Amino acid sequence: MHLVRGFVLVATLSWSATVEAAEPRSPPPKVFESGHTATPATATSKAPVDQLIPWLLSEDRELREIPFNEVIVRVTGKKMVACDPKNQIDERVVKSISAACDETVKRLNAPDSAIKNIARINEVSGHFEDMLRELLNATPGLNCDFPRTAQGRVMRSGYPDLRIVDLASKRVFYLDPKLYAAGSRDSSFRAFYFEPKIATNKVRDDAVHFIAGFEHEPREKSGRWNFTRWDLVDLAQFRVKLKAEFQGSNHDMYRPEAIVATSAK
């Protein structure tokens, strides 16, 4: 949503630790992702930014306790299906994912693991995605790959990371691996985000949505990472909050015409 040159409104959905009573809220201003209002601006109508700012301030800049399944439906038009432990298909897929998680931890904890010399945990995530994809795609009866956008593009960034298909039923399961440090399980810091954009949307099926959370200990002096447990989380009851912020890049800030002084060479 382009509001002011060099700035965009970013919607970030993150884990919400506290449950708050739902309150009636005013509808958001009718501003589209492109930055256009629902009707052409006139001398008496307000510009998009003039509509948006008062609404953000009145909502305390955050919307809390939003059901993530409703976000998915509104943004993508696809339903989020709850995992049913009594359903044979769900049970079979959960069992296969569990086995893949066990094997992933085993392989990436090995002394000769590819992640041994990676210093930043954020750079380890891709190895979990690749390993889970490889193992699940090799599981009889399943297909696992990176989800594609409507234009057929593979995007590694953004939610979700993996798309699993049960070949017999053609049902789809989305899987998003997350890594977290031991002791931070109850942290209120952001651990999840979803950016609602049509062009980069990767949720294109009615599906079960899973998070696979892997816990790790502090990195050892030898450079080794040790993962100690994992949990498979159904996001059907997941609630999120929306936080709006205005942001700009270095390119936006350091424009030649905006620089008023510079250090001596």
Residue locations for each model-derived region?
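Short, charged, amphipathic alpha-helix that recurs within catalytic cores of restriction-modification
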Residues: 180-216
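A short acidic/basic microdomain associated with nuclease active sites
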Residues: 129, 133-165, 169
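Boundary at the C-terminal end of the N-terminal hydrophobic targeting segment
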Residues: 16-24
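Bacterial N-terminal signal peptides
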Residues: 6-15
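Interdomain/boundary linker segments immediately adjacent to catalytic/signaling cores
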Residues: 28-131
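Positively charged n-region of N-terminal signal peptides that target proteins for export
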Residues: 1-5
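Conserved catalytic cores of phosphodiester-cleaving nucleases, focusing on short active-site segments
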Residues: 162-164, 173-181
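Domain-level recognition of nuclease-like catalytic cores that cleave nucleotide substrates
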Residues: 203-264
